[in-house]
Amino acid sequence: MQYSRKTLLASSVQSVFDWHLSPEALLKLTPPWQPMEVIDYPGLAENSRAVFRTRILGIPFYWEAEHFDVQLNKQFCDRQVKGPFRQWIHRHLFLAKGNETCLMIDEVDFTLPGPRWINQILGNVIHRKIDALFEFRHQVLLQQFGERKKKTDSLSQDAEI
């Protein structure tokens, strides 16, 4: 299954990317209903690994994620190495839409463990949980950086995000 969320922020790509490099950012992006204990987080760098303890649908899990494809002020990705999903790949994109405007895009590709029917039945439930998680995260980003209103001029390249 795939998930994507986009938000236009009133800040430079560098500022938004740098903020994500901070260990405190991860804690701020964690919603109160999804408690997460950081076991090991060496920081964001190519091939760095982070280990967390969290709960999904009330079930406790250790989650180990590896960062890859880290491109300064452009993107970074993380993939689940150990955890509740068969596959989890999360891509964070930072696109400049002017000097002080950043389009932040989160893209997630995930597969649940078990047979295909598990994904069909539980996939929508998990998708809603992921949507709530990223709704919270993008609200945090809007509070941190402010919202850049889309231009309504149909000739503007910023009109479509």
Give the label of every model feature segment.
Residues 1-45:
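Hydrophobic ligand-binding cavity/cleft-lining segments
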Residues 2-4, 60-64, 87-91:
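Short, surface-exposed coil-to-beta transition loops
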Residues 6-10, 37, 53, 66, ...:
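Generic structural detector for well-ordered beta-strands
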Residues 11-13, 71-72, 97-99:
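Short loop segments at secondary-structure junctions
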Residues 37-83, 103, 136-139, 143-149, ...:
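Glycine-rich portal/gate segments that line the openings of hydrophobic small-molecule binding cavities
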Residues 79-132:
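Beta-strand/loop substructures that line and gate deep hydrophobic ligand-binding cavities in soluble
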Residues 111-114, 118-161:
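A conserved amphipathic terminal alpha-helix motif
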